[in-house]
Amino acid sequence: MSASPSPSTRADALALARWLFVVAFMVVAIVAVGGITRLTESGVSITEWKPVAGTLPPITDAQWQAEFDAYRQTPQFQLVNGPAGMTLATYKFIFFWEWVHRLLARTIGLVFAAPLAWFWIKRRIPEGYKPRLVALLALGALQGAVGWWMVKSGIVNDVKVSHFRLATHLLVALFTLGGLVWTALDLVALSKGEARSRLRGIGLLALAMLVLQLFYGALVAGLRAGTSAGGGWFNWDAWPLMQGSLYPDGVDWATGAVHALLSDVFLVHFIHRWWAWAVVAVLVVVARKLRKTNRKASIVLHSVFGTQVLLGIFTVWSGVALWIAVLHQFVGALLVAATTWSAHLLGARR
């Protein structure tokens, strides 16, 4: 049997956990801002990746004009926004959201890296946690690179970014969020003298199924498939049906099953909306298992996935209204955190 952690180790573990929860909250926030950036078509408004020099926005009229001139070379401007009459004033709006998204990413990097260095130098990181914290730092760096890789696809090849790259960008963010929450919860357990949790059983299944649902949600977003079912408030032909049918008529299988499963707007939307119920069924089981040992976690999980289902329906009925769709993405991130918490509780060694 391992020795009980010392009071100083317990205090250090709790301090680290609080720091990681702050970073996790910031990741949830950047996922929401990323949703705004996507829905306002702002992602390719900044055509260069300058990790340091790009921290400040343009100040002078000449700087703004230079940024606008660079954007005018993109397919998005030449084929969509240019013919629509985009002005410099309109460009400033989409620039703002992409700049905020990148600034928040830089801030998260600083908020993670600086305290990590301090805890490391002060030898306040408990045994066994250094590799995990370094891995989380590496995931953050990877996310920055994936973000630029995604944006580049909309600058060079198309009027919008690749839906595969968008899905990769979102999943790396949510995987990082799950890692932050799980590690923080392990540290909270250490501060109480308890063992680390194990990801297993129904908790592992729930997270795996949720990952697939989030992947298809990202494909729906990247393909602009949210409106493929139709729209209109309380229009049953748009939900639960799709354009009046249970199964959409427009699925194109001609280019092969793999292409249809990953790139057909009707089929991707269909899978996303119905796989959600399989995920809900598993989450109900998880919540019921938690009810006796942690009623609070059970209520939180029920509340979050219930809200997420309603927001998904409202997103369709509203024709993908900006703030409803952003809330859908925001609550999706909260669902990752809530499911991670639930899986951690189920995997606790007693």
From Swiss-Prot:
One of its GO terms (biological process) is heme A biosynthetic process. Heme binds at residues 272, 328. The chain crosses the membrane at residues 16-36, 77-97, 101-121, 136-156, 170-190, 201-221, 265-285, 299-321. Disulfide bonds: none annotated. GO terms for cellular component: plasma membrane. Its cofactor is heme b. Pathway: Porphyrin-containing compound metabolism; heme A biosynthesis; heme A from heme O: step 1/1. The keyword Iron applies. It catalyses: Fe(II)-heme o + 2 A + H2O = Fe(II)-heme a + 2 AH2. Catalyzes the conversion of heme O to heme A by two successive hydroxylations of the methyl group at C8. The first hydroxylation forms heme I, the second hydroxylation results in an unstable dihydroxymethyl group, which spontaneously dehydrates, resulting in the formyl group of heme A. Interacts with CtaB. PANTHER family: CYTOCHROME C OXIDASE ASSEMBLY PROTEIN COX15, CYTOCHROME C OXIDASE ASSEMBLY PROTEIN COX15 HOMOLOG. Belongs to the COX15/CtaA family. Type 2 subfamily. This is Heme A synthase. It comes from Novosphingobium aromaticivorans (strain ATCC 700278 / DSM 12444 / CCUG 56034 / CIP 105152 / NBRC 16084 / F199). The gene is ctaA.
